[in-house]
Amino acid sequence: MFSSITASQILINLNGNSIDNLSGLINFDNTIYKTIEKTYKLSSFNLDLDQSNLVKNIKLNSSIANIELTGKYNLSTLPDAFMQYLNEYFPTFVKTKTRYIYNDKADLNVKIKNFSIVNELFVKDLMVSPSSLVNCSFDASINYLNIKTTSDVISYAGVKFKNNDILVNSLTNGIKLIYNATAINLSDSLAFRNPTLVFTANDKISDFDLNWDNKLSPKNAGVISG
């Protein structure tokens, strides 16, 4: 498929000799992405990297999303640090490549502004409403992960999830996920109202509680545990 990217202004000003100390600015203004079917206006794209100090900060501002990564980390070791975290809770399924103990610590914040371009170009089954938020804190040295997400509407393969809140937290007995919403619409006529899911996993052991209640008459409610 033919495609092209054009920008009226391109600014690249970077210093450093590795991905872990690269600092500076990358800016694209009035960016246009063209395919045979459609032209997409991406507006501005600004990537600001400050990795010259112990506490690093990377900011991405675009018409699609704003993303910020802050903390004491190395981009080259963050993936291995996360695998180390997963190995602590799921040693049967996740193996580490080394005995080295990573100490990467980072906070990630994401705000969705316009997901439609990503939806049309890359993930046609997934749509996320504007102002959706993801806030994540990670500390490999103490095997800690906390994730909070909020979104008015998430659509996947025709199923709509409304007023979503997700919390993921590290516990001594595993990783716990709590999901709350006002509705999961499977179709125009079928919906689960006020669903709540609590899921805990630790290696081969897991348990969950799923319940919903439409709080209307006729009543549609249920509880599933396992």
Say what each PLM segment does.
Residues 1-80, 87-95, 108-226:
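Hydrophobic lipid-interacting interfaces of membrane-associated proteins
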Residues 99-100:
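Surface-exposed, low-complexity/disordered segments
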Residues 104-106:
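Short structural boundary motif marking the start of a folded domain
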